[in-house]
Amino acid sequence: MIKEILEKTGALMEGHFILSSGKHSSRYVQCARLFEFPEYGDIVGEELAKLLRKYDVETVVGPAMGGVILSYVVARYLKARSLFAERENGVMKLRRGFFVRPGEKAAVVEDVVTTGGSVKEVIELLKEYGANVVCVGSIIDRSGGKVDFGVPFESLLKLDLPVYDPEDCPLCKQGIPAEKPGSRGLK
C-alpha cells in the first residue's frame, strides 16, 4: 500500500540525485509529494503510529524538513506531543520554545532514512535534554539494514534503491547532471 501511494503521488522519482547524505542515487523518494495529499499523509502517519504505539511514546520529534509533518500526524494518532528540530548554524536545535523533559519518552521520526545522519543528530539533541529516546520510525528505510540508532527502528517500507559514493557514481561517469532535492544543504 505504501509503495502504491508513493507511486501515485509522484514521490518515487527516477533520475540522478544527490541525497542529503551526499551520496548519489538513480532513485529518490520525495515524501513532500506524498504530503501534498492530506489523505495519504493521514494513512502513512496512522500506519507508522501503529508500529510505534508499543513504545508508549509521549513526544514525537522529527528533523526539519522531512520529519515536520510526519511527526505531527504520528503524534496525533499516538495522542502525544509533536515537536521538530531544525538546524541553526548547521547544528540541530529545538527552537520556537520547544523542550523535552528529562525522562520523557520520545520517538524520532523521519520520512526517509538512508544513512540516518539527521535522526542521529536529533537523538543526541534529545539526550542532551535528558529525554529517553525509545524508538525511531520512518516511512521508508533505504539504509539496507546498515543503520543502527541504538533503539528499535520501525519503518513502513524498506526500499533497496541504489546508492553510490560520489567518486563511484556511474551516473556521474556517464556525465548525467545531478539534482539535489534534499533539504540539509550540508554537502
From Swiss-Prot:
Enzyme Commission code: 2.4.2.10
State which pathway it belongs to.
Answer: Pyrimidine metabolism; UMP biosynthesis via de novo pathway; UMP from orotate: step 1/2
Keyword annotations of the record: Glycosyltransferase, Magnesium, Pyrimidine biosynthesis, Transferase
Q: Which GO terms describe its molecular function?
A: magnesium ion binding; orotate phosphoribosyltransferase activity
Q: Which residue positions does the secretion signal occupy?
A: none
Binding locations of orotate: T114, R142
Biological function? Catalyzes the transfer of a ribosyl phosphate group from 5-phosphoribose 1-diphosphate to orotate, leading to the formation of orotidine monophosphate (OMP).
HAMAP family to which the protein is assigned, alphabetical: PyrE
Q: How does it assemble?
A: Homodimer.
Specify the protein name: Orotate phosphoribosyltransferase
Gene source species: Thermotoga petrophila (strain ATCC BAA-488 / DSM 13995 / JCM 10881 / RKU-1)
Q: Which gene encodes it?
A: pyrE
